A protein has these predicted regions:
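Fe-S-dependent hydro-lyases/dehydratases of central metabolism
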Residues: 1-233
Length: 233
């Protein structure tokens, strides 16, 4: 993906699935085509682990087949094989701590390949969130995006890069880590230079500074110093 193909906005292409604590409401959305109205006070399932998204036995698959088993491990047993894939859901909304547990990479991939564009939750676990970024699955903790998406608004991509370091933000704009690295290695995009001045460093920081990619085109390595918060390869 080149800079001309970077995502600048996103529009909802499917339905919104609320992973509600009410089994009847969840079932109606999954199998009866029901669409729930936006309600910021709705009780949603908390602590959905990546093990629930893709149970261990599902992880024998590693390709688009994972879409068929998205969320089949969710407590209560309401979500059956192909339910998410065949439901036409573009957004999945849940409660606290989405993506806790083992942080297995198959979890967000199953959502992406089931057609999900955006994951919205009250908070998102770090490694799960990074895995989403790396494959192009957008995430947000801003529930106010939901009515905007429902109205058909094209949401600026900046809504999904808030709080990210410069490299992570560019990964999101490019639609994932592979597309970003392709552009980086082609010289289409240049990561921000580490400008940290020489400073006392820990052993780990010294190793990172010595191995940091200073120039992707020439392969030159090494920067004078790094500090916590620096973004680099």
């Amino acid at each position: 993906m080149t800079t001309s193909q970077k995502r600048t906005s996103v529009q909802l292409k499917g339905r919104i699935l609320y992973l509600t604590e009410d089994p009847a409401q969840l079932k109606a959305q999954l199998y009866d085509g029901a669409s729930l109205p936006f309600d910021e006070h709705r009780k949603l399932v908390d602590n959905i682990s990546t093990d629930e998204l893709t149970p261990g036995w599902v992880c024998y698959y590693y390709d688009e087949t994972l879409a068929r088993y998205c969320l089949v491990g969710l407590r209560g047993g309401q979500i059956k094989q192909d339910a998410i894939k065949n439901g036409g859901f573009g957004v999945i909304v849940s409660g606290l701590s989405k993506g806790c547990g083992s942080s297995r990479e198959t979890a967000p991939y199953s959502e992406l390949k089931a057609g999900v564009q955006i994951v919205i939750a009250k908070n998102i676990e770090k490694i799960y969130g990074q895995n989403c970024q790396n494959i192009g699955l957008l995430t947000s903790t801003d529930v106010s995006l939901i009515p905007r998406l429902e109205s058909g608004e094209a949401i600026p991509i900046e809504e999904f890069t808030k709080g990210l370091d410069p490299i992570a933000a560019e990964v999101v704009r490019h639609g994932g880590l592979f597309a970003y690295n392709q552009a980086r290695l082609q010289g289409v995009i240049v990561p921000p230079m580490v400008t940290t001045a020489a400073r006392p460093m820990t052993l780990c920081e010294k190793i990172i500074a010595k191995s940091a990619i200073a120039d992707a085109k020439t392969g030159r390595l090494g920067v004078p110093a790094v500090k916590p918060g620096d973004a680099l390869f």
